[in-house]
A protein has these predicted regions:
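Conserved N-terminal Rossmann-fold NAD(P)-binding element of oxidoreductases
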Residues: 3-7
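N-terminal Rossmann-fold NAD(P) dinucleotide-binding loop
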Residues: 12-13
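Conserved acidic E/D residue at the C-terminus of a beta-strand in Rossmann-like folds
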Residues: 27-30
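Helix N-cap at the beta1-alpha1 junction of Rossmann-like dinucleotide-binding domains, i.e.
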Residues: 32-34, 97
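Conserved Rossmann-fold cofactor-binding substructure of NAD(P)-dependent oxidoreductases
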Residues: 51-63
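ADP-ribose/adenylate-binding Rossmann-like module
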Residues: 82-100
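Rossmann-fold NAD(P)-binding glycine/threonine-rich loop
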Residues: 94-114
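C-terminal catalytic/substrate-binding lobe primarily of soluble NAD(P)-dependent oxidoreductases
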Residues: 134-372
Length: 372
């Protein structure tokens, strides 16, 4: 079994390293630094290539049995489309803003199985929702999730576990919720509230546009929301930058040069938010599902708390996200899920065997979702 992993960032490297224990894996990236990290620590094959050149994919991917799409979000949709056009099965973790289900007909036509949003949230949150949706009548679904540094450094008290550009996109995109059966659009970062967690103390939750596919696949659930978790105070800093125009996309003239404020801000925040090797962090997620089963009220909660792995020097967000992606990839590899088309995880969770497989795959790697 030959697997191609497109993208060798923090999560992409974790995906390639884990899969290489059982399969012949090749990692593709245009950044030689990322590839060098893999070369030094694994036996993963590494090839430098510009993955925005989709015209080369047919030749590039012809010998591979499965593709993992781990490129940054801004190039994810077109990359997935190119992979599907090559007729290759794919697990996608690029978290692009476009609607992946728009590619369903193409995937069916090309006889491709494509599982998208294969991470933590979206990803595992969707899988869990899909599983319980098959067992009970759900009235409300709430997901709170965040990846944070253990060491709090002012002013932002934050390190980006993935591309800072994707974080800024998350902070600026309006949030879609479902309230009383209707989709409601709220400003990003709105409705902040403080919540206490056993492992980390008080965190602040904020609206973000994380429901994604379940807005369309779970329309029968009357109340659904997803919120991002940060240390208290972080949100007010971001809101101040936003209100002052630092995230504006229209060009302004500075000393005779036209620049976009968001580009300058991104460059500055990239350095501020860059996680250094060895920086300890954690991932936390809480899922609350309320409804009825056999006409009896039922509440279900899941809690994920995972920390940086000191032994393997693997960030928690890379572990929780990358291993989830690999669990879904193995569903395809082992033919446990072989339907053709584009499928977000909630459409896979309704199969109990698939649900158990993914949960056990993660548990075997020390990532455990505790149910109460």
């Amino acid at each position: 079994m030959k697997i191609a992993v497109l993208g060798a960032g923090m999560v992409g490297r974790t995906i390639a390293t884990d899969l290489s224990k059982d399969f012949d894996v090749t990692s593709f990236d245009r950044d030689e630094t990322n590839l060098d990290i893999l070369r030094k620590n694994t036996d993963v094959n590494c090839i430098k290539v510009d993955l925005s050149l989709h015209e080369c994919f047919k030749e590039l991917l012809k010998d591979f049995d499965l593709i993992v799409n781990a490129v940054p979000g801004f190039m994810g949709y077109k990359t997935l489309e190119a992979i599907i056009n090559c007729g290759k099965n794919v697990a996608d973790i690029s978290f692009f803003p476009e609607d992946a289900l728009a590619l369903h007909a193409l995937a069916v036509q090309k006889n491709v199985t494509a599982i998208v949003d294969c991470g933590v949230a979206p990803g595992m949150s969707n899988l869990i929702l899909g599983y319980h949706n098959s067992l009970m009548k759900i009235d409300s679904f709430e997901c709170m999730v965040g990846g944070l540094p253990k060491k709090r450094v002012k002013p932002f008290e934050y390190k980006a576990p993935f591309s800072p550009l994707d974080v800024i996109e998350e902070y600026t995109r309006p949030a879609r919720y479902v309230e009383n059966g209707f989709v409601v659009i709220k400003p990003a970062l709105s409705d902040a509230e403080f919540i206490n967690f056993e492992h980390v103390g008080t965190l602040e939750s904020l609206n973000t546009d994380g429901l994604r596919s379940i807005l369309f696949t779970m329309k029968h659930i009357p109340d659904m929301k997803e919120k991002t978790l940060r240390y208290p105070g972080h949100i007010s800093l971001i809101q101040a930058l936003m209100q002052a125009g630092f995230f504006n996309e229209e060009e302004i003239n500075v000393k005779g040069k036209n620049v976009r404020p968001i580009d300058v801000t991104s460059a500055i925040l990239f350095d501020q938010w860059k996680a250094e090797p060895g920086d300890e962090e954690f991932t936390i997620m809480k899922i609350i599902i309320k409804g009825t089963e056999n006409d009896v009220p039922k509440n279900v909660e899941y809690l994920l708390y995972d920390e940086y792995d000191i032994t393997t020097q693997t960030p928690s967000m890379s572990r929780t996200t990358g291993y989830a992606c690999n669990a879904f990839a193995n569903l395809i590899i082992n033919k446990k899920f072989d339907k053709k088309g584009v499928f977000p995880p909630e459409l896979i969770g309704n199969d109990e065997a698939c649900f158990r497989f993914v949960m056990n795959y993660l548990k075997d790697r020390g990532v455990e979702y505790k149910k109460s």
